[in-house]
Every structure is written in C-alpha cells, then in structure tokens.
Design a protein with these regions (language model features):
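Residue-level signal for short, function-critical loop segments
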Residues: 19, 114, 146, 173, ...
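Residue-level signal for threonine
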Residues: 1, 127, 152, 272
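N-terminal secretory targeting modules
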Residues: 1-107, 284, 288-295
Length: 295
C-alpha cells in the first residue's frame, strides 16, 4: 500500500497491470484494482467509494471526500493479484498530494498461501492481512504465495531476514496433500521453522495456523473437507507436543477459532469477503487478547 496526505476532496488514480485484469473466480476490482481508506485522528478508518473504469489503463476517481484535512492520512491498497507496471496518483490543480515514507516500526510478518495473498476478496482492502493491519494499526508484510506456502527451510531463511514483532505461519492450506506431505514431514517443517526463527529472534511470538477450512460444515464435498480437517489435526498434534515440551512464545490459531461456515468461502477453500473478515477477526482476538500485542 501507499500512504499519502492531500487537501483535495477529489483523487484520481491511473494504473496499468501486467496480467489479465480478472479471474473466473475473482473480480477485476480484487485482481487488478485499488482501494482507498482514510485514517481519522482517533485511529478509525473510513472507506472511500470510486468511479471505476477497467480498460487498458485502469482509472479510479474518488470524489466528494468530506473534508480531507480531517484525516491523518490516506492509504491506497494495491492490487491483490496483479503486478503493477506503473501507477499515478493525481489531484486537481492548486491542491497538494504528499507521499509519506514507509512506517518506521517492526512489522508483523505473515507467510502463507494464496489465501494470505488475498484470494478471493472482492477488493484489496478486504484481504485479511489488510483488514488486520487496520485493526491493529500495524505494519504488515504479506508473504503469501499461491500454491507455494509450504514451510520450506529456504523460505523460513528468507522470512527470518525480517526483524518482526510477530511471525504468522499460515501454510496448512498448501500442505494437505498427504501423498506429498506426510505427518512426519509437516512436523519436521513446523519444528524447523520454530527453531530457526527463535534462534535468530528469541522471544518473538510465532503463530501456527490450522487450515481455515479444516472443520465440518463448510461445504458438502466431504472428501476434500476431510483432507483439510486431517492436516489441521496434524498441525494441532504437533503444536500440542511442542507446548508439552516447554517451547515458549508459540501460539495456535485453530480452524474453530476462524469459524468458517457455509457462507465463508467461494469454493470451499478460499475465503470470500465474509470469510476474510472472519479470518482477520480471529487473528485480532488472538493477537490482542492472548499474545497481548496491541500495536
């Protein structure tokens, strides 16, 4: 995202993206669009509607913004899936627009799958990491990789290069295939991740997350549901052993905590907007009330 200030009640965005603007299962507004929020002086966030045109150059026009000077700053979220070739932010003549530097604070680092990447929210501000960042007023680094969030040692090494205040490891949605990932392999990867992160960042909390769709009652495809439930059970068993061994500063977000139901996903796996809100709320509750991290 990009933070900026302006005294204009009209804001123009122009951008071009590198890939297809939409997917069969995800609208152009989520795949290739942007999203504008404004942060108030007391920490509250307001969303801003836009007039949108998806052509070769994508345009957004935000207008009639009530007294922009009242807001601490604006936050423009970038596309959830597409790479941006170029982007312009504009305001009418005689108004100002000032880009703000990156937040100078330790981030929350989240490593995971396409779900973390934002699939399948309808617009960028509704990806769960973006919702959580607003709720916690915290800098977030999203390391979501479609089909490739698998807790590989090489990826943990890269995650470990970032000095974070919290690490979220949400990879079970890419580890459910037992023909590729045995229970023993999942345990090996979870233990390696904990050991390596705490070796370099002692005392920093780590969250291990179950498969968000790993509970009964989400969809009628019970064959797939049982695979998701099974990998959640493996994750829970490993976490329980680690806690019993006295490993500290590790936490678990369960599928029950996330609490998906029949309205939460687009395809039985990836959350829709409802599921994204449930996901973010579950993380927020764990981080604020159990870990005690406020900002």
């Amino acid at each position: 995202y990009i933070n900026f200030t302006t005294n204009s009640s009209t804001i123009y965005i122009r951008l071009k993206v590198k890939g297809a603007q939409a997917m069969a299962q995800m609208p152009a507004t989520g795949v290739s669009g942007v999203d504008l929020y404004a942060k108030g002086p007391l920490g509250s966030w307001s969303w801003t509607k836009a007039t949108v045109n998806f052509k070769d150059t994508i345009t957004y026009k935000f207008e009639n913004i009530h007294d922009p000077a009242l807001f601490e700053y604006f936050r423009l979220y970038l596309p959830l899936c597409n790479a941006v070739s170029w982007l312009e932010i504009g305001v009418p003549e005689n108004f100002t627009c000032t880009l703000l530097p990156a937040q100078n604070e330790k981030p929350i680092v989240a490593y995971g799958t396409s779900i973390m990447h934002g699939a399948y929210a309808s617009r960028p501000g509704l990806g769960w990491t973006n919702i959580l960042g607003r709720k916690l007023n915290s800098k977030m680094i999203n390391l979501g990789f479609s089909g490739n969030g698998q807790l590989e040692p090489a990826m943990i090494d890269l995650v470990n290069e970032i000095d974070a205040k919290l690490y979220i490891l949400d990879c079970m949605p890419n580890l459910w295939d037992k023909t590729k990932f045995s229970a023993e392999e999942i345990e090996k990867r979870m233990r390696h991740a904990e050991a390596e992160i705490h070796k370099k960042h002692p005392g920093v909390p780590i969250i291990f997350t179950e498969h968000c769709s790993g509970k009964d009652g989400i969809n009628l495809d019970t064959v797939m549901a049982q695979k998701y439930i099974a990998v959640s059970q493996i994750s829970a068993a490993v976490f329980k052993k680690m806690k019993k061994e006295g490993i500290k500063n590790i936490y678990q977000l369960t599928a029950k905590d996330i609490n998906f139901d029949t309205e939460s996903t687009l395809d039985g796996t990836h959350p829709n907007d409802i599921g994204m809100i449930q996901y973010a709320n579950a993380y927020y509750h764990l981080i604020r009330n159990k870990i005690g991290l406020s900002q």
